[in-house]
């Protein structure tokens, strides 16, 4: 049995989020949350928030035991890029790219492992 949670349009680069995800991929959920809690990256807070949502979905929608859950799949897709302009000298302008990310976390029972 699997439970899924998706957080969309997070204002962080997908590359930065993937660096955090690589650390917790495949871990039991309680250990992953403890690991994310002590990571200094902003992406760790967003991944932890999505993971907590997936755990809640598993407990309430599928009656799964929290102690049996592990991270089956976790990935970050690129969302739309916000484009802004910054005025520069002599009437020029530079383009500023503000990337967004879609975070997906799938948790499953250890019995499925």
UniProtKB/Swiss-Prot annotation:
Transmembrane segments: none
UniProt-listed Pfam families: Ribosomal_L22
GO molecular function terms attached to this record: rRNA binding; structural constituent of ribosome
GO biological process terms, semicolon-separated: translation
Cellular component GO terms, alphabetical: cytosolic large ribosomal subunit
Signal peptide region: none
InterPro entries linked: Ribosomal_uL22, Ribosomal_uL22_bac/chlpt-type, Ribosomal_uL22_bac/org-type, Ribosomal_uL22_sf
Alphabetized CDD domains for the sequence: Ribosomal_L22 (cd00336)
Keywords: Ribonucleoprotein, Ribosomal protein, RNA-binding, rRNA-binding
Superkingdom, natural source: Bacteria
Role summary: This protein binds specifically to 23S rRNA; its binding is stimulated by other ribosomal proteins, e.g. L4, L17, and L20. It is important during the early stages of 50S assembly. It makes multiple contacts with different domains of the 23S rRNA in the assembled 50S subunit and ribosome.
Quaternary assembly: Part of the 50S ribosomal subunit.
PANTHER family the UniProt entry points to: CHLOROPLAST 50S RIBOSOMAL PROTEIN L22-RELATED, LARGE RIBOSOMAL SUBUNIT PROTEIN UL22M
Protein family according to the UniProt entry: Belongs to the universal ribosomal protein uL22 family.
Protein name: Large ribosomal subunit protein uL22
């Amino acid at each position: 049995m699997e439970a899924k949670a998706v957080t969309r349009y997070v204002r962080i680069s997908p590359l930065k989020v993937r660096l955090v995800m690589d650390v917790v991929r495949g871990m039991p959920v309680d250990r992953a949350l403890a690991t994310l809690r002590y990571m200094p990256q902003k992406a760790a807070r967003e991944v932890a928030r999505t993971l907590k949502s997936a755990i809640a979905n598993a407990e309430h929608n599928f009656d799964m035991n929290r102690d049996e859950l592990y991270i089956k799949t976790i990935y970050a897709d690129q969302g739309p890029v916000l484009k802004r302009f910054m005025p520069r000298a002599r009437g020029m302008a530079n383009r500023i790219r503000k990337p967004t990310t879609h975070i997906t976390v799938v948790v499953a029972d250890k019995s499925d492992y």
